[in-house]
A protein has these predicted regions:
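Glycine-centered secondary-structure boundary/capping sites
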Residues: 35, 49, 154, 160-161
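Short acidic/polar capping segments at secondary-structure boundaries
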Residues: 15-17, 25, 50-51, 77-80, ...
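Hydrophobic, well-structured mid-protein blocks that either form specific transmembrane helices
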Residues: 24-69
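An acidic-aromatic
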Residues: 1-40
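Gly/Pro-enriched, hydrophobic low-complexity segments
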Residues: 60-160
Length: 161
């Protein structure tokens, strides 16, 4: 998989030869690849330790009913809950994020299971993503590079020859 911000490139691997795919990044979803409807931009934000924020009109901070910590609830005017952000007791660390559709059904859940300091940045060491039902995966990030010079060509996956 690769993305240059304009296009999302990937190889679909099944029986036979890999199939090269190129779709607009704005339409990209990893549903066909990992069975979770998450956008590549969201994955990149999560890997960078950022929280992808959904459009919202209201923000409410609640103390968690079970366990310690707080929940930041982002709501849209006619939609209801768009996103929930679960934080620690000090409100300094995000532990879990949940995204919802307009029916209130969970789209996906992302958890920062372990964090690490790399060159002064707080980034995930272990990240888990789930649809809340039958699909989930875990990313273990053990090599992190920061402030690396990059060129546009590094983000393009070319079709096979």
């Amino acid at each position: 998989m690769a993305s240059d911000g304009k296009w999302f490139y990937y190889y679909e691997i099944g029986e036979g030869n890999p199939i090269y795919k190129k779709i607009p990044a704005t339409d990209a979803s990893l549903m066909r690849i990992i069975s979770i409807p998450i956008q590549p931009a969201d994955i990149l934000d999560l890997i960078a330790g950022r929280v992808p924020l959904r459009e919202h009109h209201t923000v409410i901070l609640h103390k968690q009913d079970t366990g310690q910590g707080y929940v930041l609830v982002l709501k849209r005017r006619w939609w209801g809950v768009a996103e929930k952000i679960y934080m620690d007791e000090n409100k300094t660390r995000v532990r879990l994020i949940e995204y919802y559709n307009r029916n209130g059904t969970l789209i996906y859940r992302a958890g920062f299971n372990e964090m690490q300091m790399v060159s002064g940045f707080q980034v995930p060491a272990r990240l888990s993503i789930s649809n809340g039902e039958d699909a989930d995966f875990q990313l273990d990030l053990n090599r992190y590079y920061t402030d690396v010079p990059v060129t546009d060509s590094m983000f393009v996956l070319n079709p096979p020859d």
